[in-house]
């Protein structure tokens, strides 16, 4: 999948386009769109207490937690004490947006992931909710 055109685009809080810039979730939304697996956009989770972030994400976004990284999936990290997400573009590498460098590629192991997710379609998300 093509993503070279996204590299070095500046960081922008709540950014969702190449023209305005991206935040980490914005780049994940863009990559999922390009992959044909749209990721629901969410409001600014930085305003939520840390204890509620995972519940909000797992309940409001079309993702499913998985045990290991998967190309086309998401990796969750903490960066400077805040929730951060990257899109897994190839084995061992994520594309993500940082405040100081904008959109970059980083080896997953440097980021020390705390969770991995796959993006699921709406019918799978509804099925998962019913199973709970």
List where the protein language model places each region.
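Absolute protein N-terminus
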Residues: 1-2, 80
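Active-site nucleophilic cysteine motif
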Residues: 17-35
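A glycine-biased structural micro-motif
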Residues: 4-16
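...with weaker cross-activation on analogous glycine-rich loops/strands in unrelated enzymes
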Residues: 40-111, 120, 125, 129-130
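Onset of an N-terminal alpha helix
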Residues: 3-4, 21
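Short intrinsically disordered terminal tails
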Residues: 1, 131-132
